[in-house]
Amino acid sequence: MGSEAMLPVALLIGYLLGSIPFGLILTKLAGTQDLRSIGSGNIGATNVLRTGRKGLAAATLLGDALKGTAAVIIAGYLGGSNAAMLAGLGAFLGHLFPVWLKFRGGKGVAVYIGILIGLLWPYAIFFCLVWLATAFASRYSSLAALVASVLTPIVLWAFGHTALAALFALLTLLLIYMHRENIKRLRAGTESKIGAKK
């Protein structure tokens, strides 16, 4: 299959991998309450942490990141760099809007990191360092994710990675949209801080 013909396949591969709801699967296997009825109702690692199962939350974070990385690596091997980037976009969309869960998924932070790892891993380290610094200073997980995701495409662009900067600018816009309720709570001063009980 030619590289051009591979592009829609890469998008589909990414979407299907991204649609795997690790948080929901792991919490069901562990016999906990339906994740969608806990806390924010989100299927990501932050909400899994609200079950009190730190191991499950870590496993969810890892699984969600790995599906982004796997999509990029598989598509890159089959169709090159453009296919890899499209697979990353597909994985992100799959996580946010999974077909298996009536298009109601997670917020995309772990998958964002996983895609960065697959495409240009040093920038995943940059993202995590910014996240940690912001989270330490503010105690807000959502704010840390927003700051790190906004800075990532700017830094990619500054170092000449224009195609990747464009991709991650799009992912950042989607991530901001998925955090719109968090942004409202941050502005109102009602957002939960890291370590706070809900």
Curated annotation (Swiss-Prot):
Superkingdom? Bacteria
- Its EC number(s): 2.3.1.275
Cross-referenced Pfam families, in alphabetical order?
G3P_acyltransf
Q: Report the family membership.
A: Belongs to the PlsY family.
Q: Its GO CC terms?
A: plasma membrane
Where in the cell is the protein located? Cell inner membrane
Q: Which residues pair up as cystines?
A: none
The record, for SMART domains, names:
G3P_acyltransf
Question: In the UniProt record, what gene is named as encoding this protein?
Answer: plsY
InterPro entries the UniProt entry points to: G3P_acylTferase_PlsY
Give the transmembrane ranges.
6-26, 56-78, 83-101, 113-133, 154-174
GO MF annotation terms: acyl-phosphate glycerol-3-phosphate acyltransferase activity
**Membrane-topology annotation of the record:** Multi-pass membrane protein
Q: Summarize the protein's role.
A: Catalyzes the transfer of an acyl group from acyl-phosphate (acyl-PO(4)) to glycerol-3-phosphate (G3P) to form lysophosphatidic acid (LPA). This enzyme utilizes acyl-phosphate as fatty acyl donor, but not acyl-CoA or acyl-ACP.
Q: Which UniProt keywords apply?
A: Cell inner membrane, Cell membrane, Lipid biosynthesis, Lipid metabolism, Membrane, Phospholipid biosynthesis, Phospholipid metabolism, Transferase, Transmembrane, Transmembrane helix
Summarize subunit and interaction data from the UniProt record for this chain: Probably interacts with PlsX.
The metabolic or biological pathway listed in the UniProt record of this protein is: Lipid metabolism; phospholipid metabolism
- GO:BP terms for this protein? phospholipid biosynthetic process
Query: Which chemical reaction does it catalyze?
Result: an acyl phosphate + sn-glycerol 3-phosphate = a 1-acyl-sn-glycero-3-phosphate + phosphate
Coiled-coil region list: none
Q: Please report the name of this protein according to its UniProt entry.
A: Glycerol-3-phosphate acyltransferase
